[in-house]
Amino acid sequence: MNEAVSPSALSTLFTDARTHNGWRETPVSDETLRELYALMKWGPTSANCSPARIVFIRTAEGKERLRPALSSGNLQKTLTAPVTAIVAWDSEFYERLPQLFPHGDARSWFTSSPQLAEETAFRNSSMQAAYLIIACRALGLDTGPMSGFDRQHVDDAFFAVSTLKSNLLINIGYGDSSKLFARLPRLSFEEACGLL
């Protein structure tokens, strides 16, 4: 039986964690990015389909390629973040299912239904983005996820000759707490949940 994590771990992962818009000038190493993926890849997906593909942008050149796709409110926070992750989904993720889900012919579930394939890829890559955020927090990093960008521009700039489509962006680094806004409220259990 699994044991609950400590209250301090829950604080790190959830209750004390914040979305950051300002960053300290502390780099995030490539080794740390590999550690992040080594954790997040274990999060569950439908039939283990694992459709997320991630591009970690660490260079000024990469940020300049991304700049035209950013909304004005997301520009400065992204250009100053040590890393910006493009979380994308592979529209042909099912080609890896013989390796990832060898228990049956799962590939045919999706080759016979392009709509199901797209819905599955988008939904599950979104879940994997959440796992990435939790992995960042677990390793002492802060994040700033964003959906305010021009997806077509990102796809043209980074994925033009591939089967990848962008889902969201996540800024990653060590946040500057002095630039945080006051904590915003969340919905109560009664407002957001039901019991049947």
Swiss-Prot record:
Induction notes from the record: Up-regulated by the nitrogen regulatory protein C (NtrC also called GlnG) and repressed by RutR.
Gene Ontology biological process terms, A to Z: nitrogen utilization; uracil catabolic process
Record GO terms (molecular function): 3-hydroxypropionate dehydrogenase (NADP+) activity
Cofactor(s), by name: FMN
Domain of life: Bacteria
A Pfam family matched in the record: Nitroreductase
Alphabetized InterPro entries for the sequence: Nitroreductase (IPR029479), Nitroreductase-like (IPR000415), Nitroreductase_HadB/RutE (IPR050461), RutE-like (IPR023936)
Function: May reduce toxic product malonic semialdehyde to 3-hydroxypropionic acid, which is excreted.
Keyword line: Flavoprotein, FMN, NAD, NADP, Oxidoreductase
E.C. number(s) listed in UniProt: 1.1.1.298
Protein name: Probable malonic semialdehyde reductase RutE
Catalytic activity: 3-hydroxypropanoate + NADP(+) = 3-oxopropanoate + NADPH + H(+)
Protein family membership: Belongs to the nitroreductase family. HadB/RutE subfamily.
Coiled-coil intervals: none
Stored CDD domains: RutE-like
Gene assigned in the entry: rutE
